[in-house]
Regions:
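Conserved motor-coupling elements within RecA-like helicase/translocase cores
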Residues: 256-272, 288-289
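ATP-dependent helicase/translocase motor core
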Residues: 1-215, 224, 228-240, 267-268, ...
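Conserved RecA-like helicase motor-core motifs
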Residues: 215, 230, 237-261
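Structural recognition of the conserved hydrophobic beta-strand(s) that form the central parallel beta-sheet
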Residues: 86-88, 272-275, 322-327
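Hydrophobic positions in the central parallel beta-sheet of the AAA+
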Residues: 218, 272-274, 297
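Conserved helicase/translocase P-loop NTPase motor core
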Residues: 269-285
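Short beta-alpha junctions and helix-cap segments that line functional grooves
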Residues: 203, 232, 256-260, 283-286, ...
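Signature of the SF2 helicase/ATPase Hel1-core->accessory helical subdomain module
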Residues: 59-62, 97, 280-286, 290-336
């Protein structure tokens, strides 16, 4: 059963609807019947819920109202498909991921921002930027994270700068000609605590779904970080089974250099997590030959790991590759 076809965003058989004033009977004895302001549907399923307040009211009142609805079990049954909650006044707008009553936290309700990082408070500007098609569809699918971290399971929605960074990289990857050779796509500069892991995972996952990409390799600069990164990525993997994410999902760790070699050659659009050290050891093997595949390399802490002769040798060894760097400490030409 296909509910949302990612190849038909804003096109094909996908149907978008805006429904106002949906009446919902009380789900808990003693509670009131409720009327939802505005609901956005994709193929008949509620995906984005909007609550509106007049300009004399605070936007947090709309958030509080949705918190109350969650506590009253109103976002159950068919409304369990809700992904994003939006609180609107004429002069302020915030959005957040749908959640449970006990995990509802307004600190995770964000303002939208434009590409210059200016906060968007006007409701019409927000609607044009985030609630239009195809953006609303993309936000509710491509830019959501189902975090399966043990004891911290939660649905998360990406912040504007994370969305823009991911969009820019994917857009540039679409232009890559792997037959041309090693392609340096660009760097993403993420400061500490700004959600680099989420952004890099989404970039890796979306890249792995591109028709001209065979493999995605996420490269850490120390062997010790391989396990931590693999666990983070596996927790975000929508194809993973919580009972056995290491085996069921698309994110694959590499235990040895031989394991890395085997996974690079394997079929399937896996996301491989490995280290610079394993790649360096692999290409120095006497009979090493790069697989005949289009490979996207995403390099973590690129300000440290991309310097030196060993990394240049790695780039030279993979002829059909595209390279993306993530860094929290970029080194410009005048950096000492």
């Amino acid at each position: 059963l296909t509910v949302f076809d990612q190849k038909q965003v804003g096109a094909g058989d996908t149907v978008y609807q805006v429904v106002n004033q949906i009446r919902r009977p009380a789900k808990i004895i003693g509670k009131q019947n409720r009327i939802f302001d505005t609901t956005l549907l994709i193929n008949g399923l509620p995906v984005i819920q909007i609550e509106e307040k007049r300009d004399t009211r605070d936007v947090n009142e709309a958030l509080n109202q949705m918190h109350q609805y969650i506590d009253e079990n109103q976002y159950r049954d068919i409304f369990s498909t809700l992904q994003i909650l939006v609180a609107i006044t004429p002069n302020n707008v915030k959005y957040m991921a749908n959640t449970t009553a006990d995990k509802f936290n307004k600190d995770f309700a964000f303002n939208w921002q434009n590409r210059d990082n200016a906060i968007v408070r006007d409701w019409k500007t927000f609607a044009d930027a985030m609630l239009s098609i195809p953006m609303a569809h993309q936000m509710a699918t491509n830019y959501m994270i189902l975090d399966g971290t043990k004891n911290k399971q939660a649905l998360k929605v990406m912040r504007p700068y994370q969305v823009y960074a991911t969009q820019n990289i994917i857009s540039r990857l679409k232009q890559v000609d792997f037959e041309f050779g090693s392609n340096k796509v660009g760097y993403i500069w993420h400061t500490t605590g700004s959600g680099k892991t989420i952004t890099s995972f989404k970039t890796a996952w979306l890249a792995s779904r591109m028709p001209h990409v065979d493999k995605v390799v996420f490269v850490v600069d120390r062997i010790a970080l391989t396990r931590q990164t693999s666990e983070n990525y596996q927790a975000y993997d929508p194809d993973g089974d919580i009972a056995d994410v290491a085996q069921s999902g698309v994110v694959k760790s590499t235990h040895t250099t031989t394991d890395l070699s085997r996974k690079l050659k394997s079929r399937g659009n896996d996301i491989i997590v490995t280290s610079v050290q394993k790649l360096d050891t692999l290409i120095k093997r006497k009979y090493f030959q790069a697989p005949d595949k289009n490979i996207v390399f995403i390099v973590d802490e690129a300000h440290r790991s991309t310097g030196g002769d060993s990394f240049k040798a790695i780039q030279a060894a993979f002829k059909r590759a595209a390279w993306i760097g993530y860094t929290g400490t970029p080194m410009f030409d005048d950096t000492t």
